[in-house]
Amino acid sequence: MNRTYDIVIAGGGVIGASCAYQLSRRGNLRIAVVDDKRPGNATRASAGGLWAIGESVGLGCGVIFFRMMSSRNRREAQGAAVAVDASTPHILPPAFFDLALQSNALYPELHRELIERHGMDFKFERTGLKYVIQDDEDRQYAEHIVAQIPHLAEQVRWLDREELRRAEPAVSHAAHGALEFLCDHQVSPFRLADAYLEAARQNGVELLPGTNVTGVLRQGRRISGVRTDNAGVLHCRTLINAAGAWAAELSEMATGRRIPVKPVKGQIVLTERMPRLLNGCLTTSDCYMAQKDNGEILIGSTTEDKGFDVSNTFPEIAGLVQGAVRCVPELQQVNLKRTWAGLRPGSPDELPILGPVAEVEGYLNACGHFRTGILTSAITGVLLDRLVHEETLPLDIAPFLAARFQPEPAAVAVAAC
């Protein structure tokens, strides 16, 4: 069976779904979303944090990973302190701050639009994010963060011990205080992806679940379609690579070059439902916590280089639970509902890979978002829509182009139409 579309989007996670929705809003394109639903979709590894500043300065998964590496380095240095300075990893460059803040600003209107036009509610909540300071190294890390973002001083607030206790009564009284990010909020990650896809479907996008791209067709330098395992050949003029942790494989098929995207495993814990315990999202050097609208608390997340493995492991889950209980002692009496793992699409510099490549016309990247896919999904969809329509972009995407990696050509043959 052969079908013809203007655009094929490979990947139905939150990034591909956002692209599908934004591109479908004009009603002038025939679009298909191809998604294999392989285990480990990155949306599964997310707390749903819209932590525009928090993620940009390395909180959430970033500070957990930093403290893990810090502990290892300290052991190797036989107890010597680890410096927190300008070389500290995970504080992302200014270009990402711009991307993140612009994306964050889109969510209130996006939330209203998806509810009113499509009946889909992804549970946007204005919660703020607090980095709970539990020891001197946490404070040093927090001070370093503040020093890096003087231009965002109005969005950051120090809470002393008493102020933290008033804001979050459940937090351990041993905590020294917190650094609060006022514009960082949360959504339900699963409902966000579903909302994008359902709205896109209502706008006429064809969803092809359980379908995998097995080859890419080209006429000379131009994309002309894809081969799939279950839906035959899908002819198109534009292919968007939103394949998440599998994006490198699709890039190689489409361009002959393998972009440096690899899976980064994140394990997650979910509690039973309970009355409101947390007033906002919390992150520590051990874990992050977000209580959802149904009362469940999501606790995450590890950062592991384990290939495509999505199994849960006791030491890592126990570490998350212990970190959560250290911060919020009442959680010691709470039952765990389930655990799981997802695969974030990591890039070497932790920045997404967006936009065209010089070698192939009609191919666009929308991948490599690592731990910020939920946050940046809104702006990614807008950017891809404007790229397809050759319109002015709201920000410079040069820092996010695949060309920054200068990958070597792969020894593959690209199928001809």
Curated annotation (Swiss-Prot):
Q: Name one GO cellular component term.
A: cytoplasm
Q: Where is the signal peptide?
A: 1-18
Q: How does it sit in the membrane?
A: Single-pass membrane protein; Lipid-anchor
- Provide any one GO MF term from the record: glycine dehydrogenase (cyanide-forming) activity
- Its transmembrane ranges are 46-66
Q: How is its activity regulated?
A: Oxygen is necessary for cyanogenesis. Activated by succinate, glycine methyl ester, glucose and D,L-methionine in addition to glycine. Phenazine methosulfate, methylene blue, 2,6-dichlorophenolindophenol (DCIP) and ferricyanide can replace oxygen for the reaction. Inhibited by pyrrolnitrin and acriflavine at 1 mM concentration.
Claim: Cytoplasm is one of the keywords in the record: no
Q: What induces it?
A: Reduced oxygen levels.
The entry marks the following residues as binding FAD, namely: 7-21
Names of required cofactors: FAD
Entry keyword annotation includes Cytoplasm: no
EC number assigned by the record: 1.4.99.5
> What temperature-related properties of activity are listed for this protein?
Not stable at 0 degrees Celsius. Decrease in activity up to 40% immediately after freeze-drying procedure, with a further decrease up to 10% when stored at -10 degrees Celsius.
Instruction: Enumerate the PROSITE patterns for this protein.
Output: PROKAR_LIPOPROTEIN (PS51257)
Q: Which UniProt keywords apply?
A: Cell membrane, Flavoprotein, Lipoprotein, Membrane, Oxidoreductase, Palmitate, Signal, Transmembrane, Transmembrane helix
How is this protein's function tied to pH?
Optimum pH is 8.3 (in the presence of Tris-HCl). Active from 7.3-7.8 in the presence of other buffers.
Q: Which domain of life is it from?
A: Bacteria
Recorded hits in PANTHER family, A to Z, give: GLYCINE OXIDASE, SARCOSINE DEHYDROGENASE-RELATED
Job of this protein: A three-component membrane-bound flavoenzyme that catalyzes the formation of hydrogen cyanide, a secondary metabolite, by transfer of electrons to a cyanide-resistant branch of the aerobic respiratory chain.
Assembly information from the UniProt record:
Heterotrimer of HcnA, HcnB and HcnC.
| Protein name (Swiss-Prot/TrEMBL) | Hydrogen cyanide synthase subunit HcnC
Name of the gene encoding the protein in the UniProt record: hcnC
